[in-house]
Structure formats: structure tokens, C-alpha cells
Amino acid sequence: MAVHPEDKCAELPEPGSVRDKIGMFTAHSDDKRSLQPPSGRERGSVAASTSRSPQPAAGPGTTQRPPVPKKKPSLLADMGARPGFNQPRSQESCDSGTTDVLARKPVRSMTAGNGMPEGPQQTNKEMTIRSASIPARKPVPAPPSFGPPNTAQVPITRVRPSPPPPRKGGATPVSKITSLGEVKTGEISRSSQASANSKNGPAVGAEPRPKLPPRPEALSTSQSPLKSHRILLNEHDIRKGSMSPSSASTYSPLQQNGSSSSLLDQSSGLDEEALSNAIVASSLASAKALSTKKVPPPPPPQRQPRSRSILPLHSTKYDSPNDSSPTPSLRTTLRTPTKADEDQHDHHRHRKHIIPKHPHKHHEGDRKRWQSEVTEKERKRYEGVWAANKGYLIPISNPGNASSKQEDPRSAYPPSASEMVLNIVVRDIWSRSRLPAPILSQIWDLVDRQKIGLLTREEFVVGMWLIDQQLKGHKLPTKVPNSVWDSVRGVSGIKLPKFPV
């Protein structure tokens, strides 16, 4: 098997095992990597070197190296990833190989490696072999620095505008801003922003919470009525409006949840104070508004005097002077009744007793008998109706033409027809009694003695009297007695003797 010329310099190690020195070198380099975060380019180179097999750098005058054994893949990958290992070496570097290796190692690690016992060295060897099979962990990123960003290493990308946060604190957390310099320049990459949002949460939460505005002092009772309720409400609105959504978005959800109870307590206290002051001011304003003089209400109407009698039978119609009779809708032809007539008509009404003394005694005098004559009062009332309707709708005959009397039906009327009432008018007046038509026809037959369709004064008065008797409950007679005709004939108070015809 041919030996590479560069391998000759590697075969001249210093006193001590080469594997021990390589293990110490790799352990020291791992400590440095843990302290310093790798950049984006170094991550990509390390990932590429671990994924593919290591290839040696081709230099001028060199041949292809044999495949590297599979026992140390990570060690050779780390050596190839470092600057200086992949570059071609000259023969001069091979001659001074021992000094180069010593110069790359720090003094502390060399002194520590020489004085260490063999037990720890063996553990370091085992750790290097295990680390070759186990992939390297992702390094923990360092806390963000507030200095100016390095524009040479970080690519320039635009940050998408975040949506405005909800007013009442929604469940979605607000996007966090890691540094002020990155917001101004807008040079944060999406990968670094996602890692900062996922891993820098506790770092932002550790910042001190912003101080809440001082709580206003309680107003004294002497100063509360002096201030107007409008000024207090305006101050309360200004304090609420000072919390802008942009300032609220910089706080973390933990801070918002933690300070929500205190803000609610403060707002409730402000609302109670503002409401109490507003109530006091409104009461003062209403007291001033109501101080104006009010017009006294009108006095209630006086009650009308009423009779204090227990029994309603003793009360008369004329107790209330304000009672007015309703105006009649039709023209009245009868005379108004006098007080003497009413007293005479109601003479037997007041003689009635609640409990009769002799229940089996027949009151013969109190019984209403058939009247054989028309009273003077009734006759005057009926004559008034006759006087208002006599001669109505009766044509007047012309006495000059004798030939026309035979042909004209008006010639059958007597010369005194103007003092009579026509049958049509009689039917209209008698029908107002609401008696049935057969009864009215019977009364007409009893009264009409001339059979010419006209009624004289006596006939009309007797007919009216028969209607009233029928309404009172008396039956119609088969023939009108002579006493009734005599009571309505002539002048009242004078009786004329009957002469034979």
C-alpha cells in the first residue's frame, strides 16, 4: 500500500499519544462552540459536512487519498470544516508539523492535559468516539444584543406588518419585538425571528412590568359639589384613552393577564367615583330647576248637596234644581201639565202602605172603573191635537163653476171640511200610539159616523180618548155610550137639552 508523502509528517508525533491530543483539541473546541453561537454560514457548512462523506482538498502535485475508515466520521468532518485543514500543504509545513499543532492549542489546555491522569484521558477518548455516532445538538442562541445589526452577515428582508391586537385581550398572543434596531432597519430574517419568538419568551417576560398610573386621591365631601359632573366624566375618558393599542401590544400576554385584575379594580373605582359625583351634581341641578314657583292646581268642584234621608220613597222629583227636562225632538201639541193635576193623579200613591192592615178587605173605592164620560182635562188635551191638524191636505172647492162640482171628487166634501181632519192624517197620528193596526181600525169604525173619510172635532176627540183607555188596559166597547158623546159636545159647563128630530 503506497504511503502518501503528507502522511510522513503525521507519523512523527511528539511524545505522547496522538489520539489523546486530538481528543483534547476537540473537547476544547466544543467548549468554545458552546460559548459562541455559530453563524448561518457555519451552520450550513457543518450540516453539509456531516451529511456527505469528507473529501480531501485537491492540491497541486497530490494524489487521491484512500477512503477514510468509518470509525471516525465526525472527527474528520470537524477537521475538514475548519479553515486551514482543506487547504494544500507544502513540504515546509510537514517539516514543522509539530510546532503547528502546538501553536494551535492553548497553553492552559496543554498544561492541563500533561498533568491529567490516565483515567480521565480514557473517558475523553470514549466521549469522542460516542460523539462521532451521535449528531451534535443545536447550540443555544445567545440573548439578543441591542447594538446595531451586522448588515454583512444577515440578509435584508422585510417584516410583515402584524395585525392590530384585540381591544379586550384576545387569546392570540401579540407578536414580540426583540430589539429596537431591528424594527428601524427591518433587517430580520424569518428564521431568526421565529427562533427568537419561540425561545426568547421568558427573557421578555423577565423584564420589569410598566408602572401603572397613580390612583387619583379620593375627593373630599366639601370639594365634590363644587366640580361639575361633566369635567369629571371628561377626565375619566382622557385617562381611559391614554392606553393606546400600540403601547398595549408591546406587553406580553403574561403581563396583560397579570395586570388585568388591577386595571379592572381601578376602572371600577373610577366609575363609582364618577357616578357618585354625577349624582350629586344632578341632584343640585334638579333642586335649582324645581325652585321656580308652581301654579297651584285648580280647586276641586264642590259637591252637590244630597238628601240625607234613608228611605228613598220620601224623595220627590224637585229635589235637584239643576235637573232640566230634555228638549223634545217633535213638536208638542198638548198643554204642559200643572202641579195640581199631578197631585190629583198621584193622590192614591201616597196612601199605599208597605204592610196592609186588612189583607182580605176589598178596596172598592180604589178600583179603577169604566169611565162613562171624558173629563175636562182630557178633552182640552185632545182638542189641542185636533186644532193643530184640522184642514190639512183637504182641497178647497171652487163655488163659481157648477159643472165642475159634479166631475170633481172634492164636491163630495161638506162645506165645513176645513174644520175636519183627513183620514190619512188621522192614521199618522194614531199610529204613534204603537197599537196594532186591527185595534186602530176598530176605533175608526166606532167613531166615523159620516162615512166620508173625514172626522169632526167630537169624533176625533172620542177616538183619542178610546186609544188612551186601550193603553190603560180597558177593553173597547161595542158601542160608544151617549154619555161620552155628550161630554165632548158643546161648551164645558153648559148642557144642552136633546130635541127630538
From Swiss-Prot:
SUPFAM superfamilies on file: EF-hand
Gene3D superfamilies: EF-hand
Basic residues bias locations: 347-362
Biased composition (Low complexity): 242-269, 324-337
Listed Pro residues bias regions: 138-147
SMART domains cross-referenced by the UniProt entry: EH
Function: Positive regulator of phosphatidylinositol 4,5-bisphosphate turnover and negatively regulates signaling through the cell integrity pathway. Involved in rDNA silencing.
Stated family: Belongs to the IRS4 family.
One GO term of the biological process aspect: lipid metabolic process
Protein name from the UniProt record: Increased rDNA silencing protein 4
Domain EH: 402-491
Biased composition, class Polar residues, residue ranges: 87-99, 188-200
Organism listed in the record: Aspergillus clavatus (strain ATCC 1007 / CBS 513.65 / DSM 816 / NCTC 3887 / NRRL 1 / QM 1276 / 107)
